[in-house]
A protein has these predicted regions:
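Glycan-processing catalytic domains of CAZymes
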Residues: 2-295
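Carbohydrate-active catalytic/glycan-binding domains of CAZyme proteins
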Residues: 296-395
């Protein structure tokens, strides 16, 4: 993580495991190693409780567990444990699995008990909620008290794993933008989730039909840049080491001795650390150490992103007050006759160099004195100098 610039990790503790002696012993051993090396390599670490399978009444088990951890690892003394993650001036604890409508035994009452208990112990809280938490539909229960619980917390993190693929993602980028607006209005911080792909193959066998392709990192990068463009100030990457669901980003062998079992490896053509590098680069952009990038890897065989059906000559690009890049292209689309007979201007714009808006034609050669009867214009840069304010206003 230090090598690739990943800021830190959330260490999951499952209530269903720590309720028994063997599970508690295992998770304590893993946490002890993680705490030790988080400080050694100066990576942030935060305890995260997964409530899946929790029974009503086990809220106190969680509160007792975190109190013991806080004392054992000096979570409330930043000088003694500088790597433990703080938020709003307090050590952070994450509680995942609140508000889902999948018939869980616990509900908002138990979640409220946990949140209030953590707050009373001096922690800040990040709450893991369903995708449709804001609209209270889809994967989310319809009880508006969920919003009250979210407002009690310091950060919320909606669960997106399995909800979309690279083709359907744009709708969810819009959802993230609207989520962030709600969060700012209600003074709660927001951590959108991204994931590299998905497969049940390693857990349930190769014939299982639940699969979301990674597209050699393009899917992950699209989400990372989408979250940053939407205004995210923090991002939760799911997951570092989740092999069962095919979401791991850590180094992974492509060929392993599996016998009759199934193993879904990384794609051919990518290095084992490819996803670590992508997340590390996104972290630099999120921290504003470098500018936003528009592609995980430039494909020189890809078609022109916005002009595939016309001849253009000497297009000019400008960034106006709205922060978008506008491309003004002279062309001869109706009908196409050649590059020396450009008879109209077309405008395209973008804010990310990936998604382009076609604003259409803004004028033709017969509308201006410098146009020729047979078609054709003077140089575009001269036209823009004379008419840019008018053109910009009309878009």
């Amino acid at each position: 993580m230090q090598e690739y610039g990943l800021d830190g990790v959330f260490m999951q503790r499952f209530i269903t495991e720590i309720r028994n002696e063997s599970g508690l012993k295992h998770f304590n051993k893993v946490l002890n190693s993680a705490m030790k090396f988080a400080n050694k390599y100066e990576r942030a670490i935060c305890v995260m409780y997964d409530l899946s399978g929790m029974q009503p009444g086990e809220e106190q088990l969680l509160l007792k567990d975190i109190a013991e951890i806080a004392e054992r690892y000096s979570l409330k003394d930043h000088a003694k444990n500088p790597s433990y993650l703080y938020h709003n001036g307090k050590p952070l604890v994450t509680v995942w699995g609140v508000g889902f409508n999948d018939n869980r035994r616990y509900g908002l009452k138990e979640a409220a008990h946990i949140i209030d208990g953590l707050k009373s112990q001096g922690f800040s809280v990040m709450l893991g909620v369903p995708t449709q938490w804001r609209t209270l539909n889809g994967d989310t229960e319809s009880d508006p008290r969920l919003h009250e619980l979210i407002r009690k917390c310091d950060i919320m993190m909606p669960w997106f794993v399995g909800r979309y693929n690279e083709t359907t993602y744009p709708k969810y980028q819009k959802l993230v933008e609207e989520d962030i607006q709600w969060a700012k209005k209600n003074q709660v911080d927001y951590a959108p989730l991204v994931f590299p792909g998905f497969s049940w193959g390693n857990l349930k066998g190769k014939d299982h039909n639940s699969f979301i392709p990674r597209n050699k990192g393009s899917f992950l990068w699209t989400q990372l840049m989408g979250a940053i463009r939407a205004g995210a100030e923090m991002i939760y990457v799911a997951m570092f080491d989740e092999i069962d669901e095919g979401t791991a980003i850590f180094k992974c062998a492509k060929k392993v001795p599996v016998g009759k079992s199934t193993f879904v490896p990384l794609e051919e053509g990518v290095e084992s650390d490819h996803y670590l590098k992508l997340v590390g680069e996104a972290a630099k952009i999120l921290r504003k150490e470098k500018a936003v990038a528009f592609s995980a890897k430039l494909d020189t065989k890809s078609p022109n992103p916005f002009i595939r059906h016309m001849y253009t000559a000497d297009p000019s690009a400008h960034v106006w007050e709205d922060g978008r890049l506008y491309v003004y292209a002279s062309h001869d689309i109706a009908p196409p006759r050649g590059c020396d007979l450009m008879d109209r201007y077309h405008v395209f714009s973008t804010d990310d160099m990936i998604n382009w808006t076609d604003h259409g034609e803004i004028l033709s050669s017969d509308q201006v004195p410098w146009g020729r009867k047979e078609g054709g214009f003077m140089w575009l840069r001269i036209v823009l100098t004379e008419t840019a304010p008018t053109i910009s206003t009309s878009l």
